[in-house]
Amino acid sequence: MSKDYISIIDVKNHVGEEVTIGAWVANKSGKGKIAFLQLRDGTAFFQAVAFKPNFIEKFGEEAGLEKFNTIKHLNQETAIEIKGIVKEDKRSKFGYELDATDLKVIGTSDNYPITPKEHGTDFLMDHRHLWLRSRKQMAIMQIRNAVIYASYEFFDQNGFVKFDSPILSGNAAENTTDLFETDYFGEPAFLSQSGQLYLEAGAMAFGRVFDFGPVFRAEKSKTRRHLTEFWMMDAEYPFMSHEQSLDLQEAYVKTLIQGVLDRAPQALGILERDTDLLRKYIAQPFKRVSYDDAITLLQEHEEDEDTDYEHIEHGDDFGSPHETWISNYFGIPTFVVNYPASLKAFYMKPVPGNPDRVLCADLLAPEGYGEIIGGSERETDYNTLLAKIKENGLNPDDYAFYLDLRQYGSVPHCGFGLGLERMVTFVAGTKHIREAIPFPRMLHRIEP
């Protein structure tokens, strides 16, 4: 048999042709003289049909019967090389099927643990290395890939330079209770929570820069929105105001959604995602509301029948129920801007004329998906930044290089970070963030 394989996703370009595909058997059915194989190859799923008389006619009685019986008794996840004629099939969601003409077993599979029945979450997570092969998990990973691709495309088209921040840091520059500590040749080192501080150095050297990589937070949170290891897309850019930064962030998120619609429509279909809703998010301007106005809204509606959040006061941080209500109230992605300085990081620039508030924004995704972006305008004055570091009980020596940036041509600059898995969860419409990364790391989950 030929080794010149084509991908399932490309069979639409070979209607009426005999092709060879390398694939795995996701499921099978049939009886008597016909067998149906559900095949997958990582690009898509589709069906191959084998007719017993065709195999006997092509290979003779004995050999044809042997091949057909092999097909009928294939186990789930058997790897095969299959040849056949591509045909249109309007009954299928995929639109095509394969009229099988030959088949060869490449790799056997016995007692595959994830059978076509309901399994508990713990069982599926214990077998995550196999669960990734399922139709839904494949669709989510294709959406993740589309988001990453669209990110690189957006930053390239907008003049950004890829800048790689370190993952290991020699000081506990943030709250050590949220940091993972490791030994670095006899000295303590910490896994990065964010590449932002280093990225600001890149912005002062190269202008617009972005970073994409894993970050780590030792938060003992057991929610559907939290992971201890996840991927962040951070960006920093000089000579830009806070309002201009919000415009850039909005354009970025809309580009990511459009990128998934363009590159992974079949994946969205498998997940039954409401694509009209996604298109609405692209078409409409994102809402912008101040923190104080959002608090007032929450207070005004806290007695409504359909609310399930606790009372909140000005100066309090939002919980997940508050974020959900705010984004659902407006029905589109919503920037909450100008939080109290006491709730945010030391490096954020105060709102002019209101030092108790800072020039920052969290982008809340609708449908209960919560914060997907956090960003701010950064403090540019050396003395002000130094005072803030001390006010927060931090050691200025740990921020020597960061402070140094303010002494040599400091300029207005902004930045933001987008959590990849939260964005994927939102666009895919899935319920839990653990499915948005190949091998999730959570509280009490570090295997496989």
Curated annotation (Swiss-Prot):
Transmembrane segments: none
Aminoacyl-tRNA synthetase as UniProt keyword: yes
A GO term for molecular function: nucleic acid binding
InterPro entries hit by this protein: Aa-tRNA-synt_II (IPR004364), aa-tRNA-synth_II (IPR006195), aa-tRNA-synth_II/BPL/LPL (IPR045864), Asn-tRNA-ligase (IPR004522), Asp/Asn-tRNA-synth_IIb (IPR002312), NA-bd_OB-fold (IPR012340), NA-bd_OB_tRNA (IPR004365)
Pfam families, alphabetized: tRNA-synt_2 (PF00152), tRNA_anti-codon (PF01336)
Subcellular location: Cytoplasm
Main localization of the protein described in the UniProt heading: cytoplasm
CC terms in the record's Gene Ontology section: cytoplasm
Catalytic activity line of the entry: tRNA(Asn) + L-asparagine + ATP = L-asparaginyl-tRNA(Asn) + AMP + diphosphate + H(+)
Example GO BP: asparaginyl-tRNA aminoacylation
Keywords: Aminoacyl-tRNA synthetase, ATP-binding, Cytoplasm, Ligase, Nucleotide-binding, Protein biosynthesis
Record-listed E.C. numbers: 6.1.1.22
Record-stated family: Belongs to the class-II aminoacyl-tRNA synthetase family.
Subunit annotation: Homodimer.
Protein name: Asparagine--tRNA ligase
Name of the gene: asnS
